[in-house]
């Protein structure tokens, strides 16, 4: 769920999860257009992953809880997750690791999505 995703982000990286809420075209609610950079691509992949999770019957990625471990920045999804939980956990784990490895451009925080995120 989103609370667990926030914790994964903070486990894997050094930035606060709030730095990603309104970043680029895909970090935060919704998304459109072309990702502005590597970090924004991480968010688009995460959005697409949640979209795939929703194809699993009764799987609600924004609310479903899952089991995972965070130890010294290493994220592991536990084996006791059901199919939906395992899928969402992996979406969040991959995204948190992607966020941690991507450069952060302050100029892409809170951009004007109407002008910068529409494909022409």
Curated annotation (Swiss-Prot):
UniProt-annotated binding residues for Ca(2+): 26, 28, 30, 47
Chief place of localization: secreted
Designated name of the protein: Neutral phospholipase A2 3
GO MF: calcium ion binding; calcium-dependent phospholipase A2 activity; phospholipid binding; signaling receptor binding
Compartments, record wording: Secreted
Organism listed in the record: Bungarus fasciatus (Banded krait)
Cofactor(s) demanded: Ca(2+)
Swiss-Prot/TrEMBL catalytic activity: a 1,2-diacyl-sn-glycero-3-phosphocholine + H2O = a 1-acyl-sn-glycero-3-phosphocholine + a fatty acid + H(+)
One Gene Ontology CC term in the entry: extracellular region
Reported function: PLA2 catalyzes the calcium-dependent hydrolysis of the 2-acyl groups in 3-sn-phosphoglycerides.
InterPro entries: PLipase_A2, PLipase_A2_Asp_AS, PLipase_A2_dom, PLipase_A2_dom_sf, PLipase_A2_His_AS
Disulfide-linked positions: 11-70, 25-117, 27-43, 42-98, 49-91, 59-84, 77-89
Active-site residues per Swiss-Prot or TrEMBL entry: 46, 92
Family to which this protein belongs: Belongs to the phospholipase A2 family. Group I subfamily. D49 sub-subfamily.
Pfam families attached to this UniProt entry: Phospholip_A2_1
Alphabetized UniProt keyword annotations: Calcium, Disulfide bond, Hydrolase, Lipid degradation, Lipid metabolism, Metal-binding, Secreted
Stored Gene3D superfamilies: Phospholipase A2 domain (1.20.90.10)
SMART domains associated with the record: PA2c
Cofactor comment: Binds 1 Ca(2+) ion.
Tissue: Expressed by the venom gland.
EC number of this enzyme: 3.1.1.4
UniProt xrefs under PANTHER family: PHOSPHOLIPASE A2, PHOSPHOLIPASE A2 FAMILY MEMBER
A single GO BP: arachidonate secretion
